[in-house]
Amino acid sequence: AYEKAVKGYITKRKPLGEALDEEIMDELSVKFGIVDDALEDLFKQIQDAGISIVDKDGNPSPLALVTDEIEKEEVSDTAMDEIVTNVRIDDPVRMYLKEIGRYPLISLDEETKLAEAIIAGGEGAEFAKQMLAEANLRLVVSIAKRYSGRGMQFLDLIQEGNMGLMKAVDKFDQTKGFKFSTYATWWIRQAITRAIADQARTIRIPVHMVETINKLIRVQRNLLQELGRDPSPEEIGKELHMAPDKVREVLKIAQEPVSLETPIGEEDDSHLGDFIEDDVIESPVDYTNRILLREQLDEVMDTLTDREENVLRMRFGLDDGRMHTLEDVGKQFKVTRERIRQIEAKAIKKLRHPRRSKPLRDFM
């Protein structure tokens, strides 16, 4: 079943030329218990098929290297000091790093005993889970530092990674040959990357759509290098086996919101919002024209009788913006609809006289 699954996966990914490291772990490694040397063989088999293994950002995956490199994750006291130096952090983070520094690292034998206690269950299982999790809190910090600067605070990344660590503790089975740090790495990375997908953007995009966007952007970047120009949706769709309309939809979803407070110019004294026209609020020119038109209209209406003026104002909504029916106006003046129609026709005829209409023609 495993070999069949690997062949099926390679067949599925070969047209794209790339495979996500997380996807390989979810669909093959974790599912079939592939670890250590067998995991290296799996990565090699996929790469030998001409498929590049990348992370979610399209960069060569560090996980496609020797698995032992993950097991040798730098989580020593020296490495913790390096994190403090290289990652922009504030006092709460320093306090947290100092706190987890109190928990000692454990040996492979101790790890095995804790795992056995977890499997055995009972009162000792919860204590063993706590010990195993605390001993690997540094691993979470070391992994989280790779994702700093991607839209989430460092402490938030650590928190999400800790949730992945707890899931790894619950699911860990040492009888399958995993070293815990290797096994936990996948769960920690998955928790962090999913959190970034969910929370880093102003407008949340579902995880499956984030993966689609990443694939599309990688193909778009490759085509740009090959063609020397921006590829069309049709060209991108051909590479991804996706309809051009779907490509356009994904590209639209992928757009990042831009703040109206974004500084413009070298002096930073102007903002993007200053240059965007408000098509809802009336412009000064339109406002001035409307006031002048109102004044001219009032002067012209003053040449009519009071009844004629009031009928036109009601019929055309000149005062309240609401046009009234002949019946409504007739009730107001206690006459028939026909009489109102006659008064309206007579008033309009008067307004069409050149002497009255000339002042209004400039506004037409």
Curated annotation (Swiss-Prot):
Q: Where is this motif: Interaction with polymerase core subunit RpoC?
A: 156-159
* DNA-binding as UniProt keyword: yes
Compartment(s) of residence: Cytoplasm
Origin, by domain of life? Bacteria
Extract the ranges annotated as region (Sigma-70 factor domain-3): 211-287
Residue segments, region Sigma-70 factor domain-4: 300-353
**Per its record, what are the GO molecular function terms?**
DNA binding; sigma factor activity
CDD domains annotated for this entry? Answer: Sigma70_r4
**Which keywords describe this protein according to UniProt?**
Cytoplasm, DNA-binding, Sigma factor, Transcription, Transcription regulation
GO BP annotations, alphabetical order: DNA-templated transcription initiation
Q: What is its main location?
A: cytoplasm
Q: Which SUPFAM superfamilies match?
A: Sigma2 domain of RNA polymerase sigma factors, Sigma3 and sigma4 domains of RNA polymerase sigma factors
Kindly name one Pfam family recorded for this protein.
Sigma70_r4
| UniProt GO cellular component terms | cytoplasm
The ranges of region (Sigma-70 factor domain-2) come to 132-202
Binding region for DNA:
326-345
Its biological purpose: Sigma factors are initiation factors that promote the attachment of RNA polymerase to specific initiation sites and are then released. This sigma factor is the primary sigma factor during exponential growth.
Q: Which NCBIfam families match?
A: PRK09210.1 (NF006666), RpoD_Cterm (TIGR02393), sigma70-ECF (TIGR02937)
Subunit structure and binding partners? Interacts transiently with the RNA polymerase catalytic core.
Q: In which family does this protein belong, per the annotation?
A: Belongs to the sigma-70 factor family. RpoD/SigA subfamily.
Protein name as catalogued: RNA polymerase sigma factor SigA
